Amino acid sequence: MEKKCLKQNSTKFVAHYRSLSTTTVAKSNVSTNERVTWFYKIENASDSSWLPFGDIEKEIIEKAFMNHEQQVQLDRCLVNLEENVRINKEDSSFRMPVKRCVGLSSDYIGLRPERFYIPQKLVKSFSDWKSNDRRFINEWQRQNRGLSMNELLEQAADGIIKEGIQLCEPIEAKWIADELLLLKNKSNEEIEKRVVSIYTRESFLYRLVNATLRENDLSKLYNLGAFCWLLFHCDCSSTFLSLGYAGKLYRGAQLDKDTIESYRQAIGLVKTWDAFSSTSKNRKKAETFGNTLFIISLAKSAKYRYSGMDISSLSLYPDEEEVLIRASRNFFVDNIEQDNVTGKYLIYLSLC
């Protein structure tokens, strides 16, 4: 059995690929503008499916392939590029066929569940916190004033490598760290766009960042604070003015009765979500999961011009139509309704 450190693809996420008709192509036929996807085949008594490697795994494999390397090491396996097989690190006799495909759609058919549907913790607004209370990003900033951009990138890279080792993801973590270190001495625009692009990838990073922020886990302040700060400040950067979005947004969730009641009790109050929030402009996709749909608008008295950053153009999944709401953005809880037909709860929020 393979070591289970962190599951990369949920069942729902990979299900889309099971029905795809894919074609392996030779290197000489590939356009540099075409999307390349690497698959491995699972075969057992109940299933025979081609499943995709993770986003970062695919980039690592593709680089090795283009460099004519015979074998590439990933966190969970080896990929032999001469024999086109995926080899279990703990049991080399356990092998799966591998293939390379070009020109597939870049998007998942719906929204990635762990990105768009994980319930956010409803907490008091930032203005309600006492001076001795500490929130993750603000506490990191308080302890790390005066760092240069290069020092920020170095700290972010070093911390992600440390977290990756703890999660049994050292190779994926090193890829992320190397990408960040390549940004040293680059323009702010190039840095910010790449930070957002890295965040959109299906990897351990966005899950870990948001779990840390939701729990306000200050033990990870050094390891994740710099990356969180970089991503947080993209929202108010001139780089993203053209990507600002002020329209209606949607996010699904599966909430228990107590959590729904907490929103009901908060009607008319200002609250916040401590984590970054992935929302979609597409209501139909957002409401396919869970018993609750958040309908998010921009308050007329909002301090900011936009609800969030439309990052779909920087994402490997543009059809998600993702708009990212920054961490700790305050909002009013306006109302709660329950749809008489579907039974789904509709929670209306307006961003301050």
For every predicted segment, state its role.
Residues 341-352:
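Short solvent-exposed strand/turn elements
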Residues 330, 336-338:
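Residue-level recognition of beta-strand microenvironments
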Residues 38-40, 84-86, 250, 282, ...:
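Structural signal for hydrophobic/aromatic residues that build the beta-strand cores
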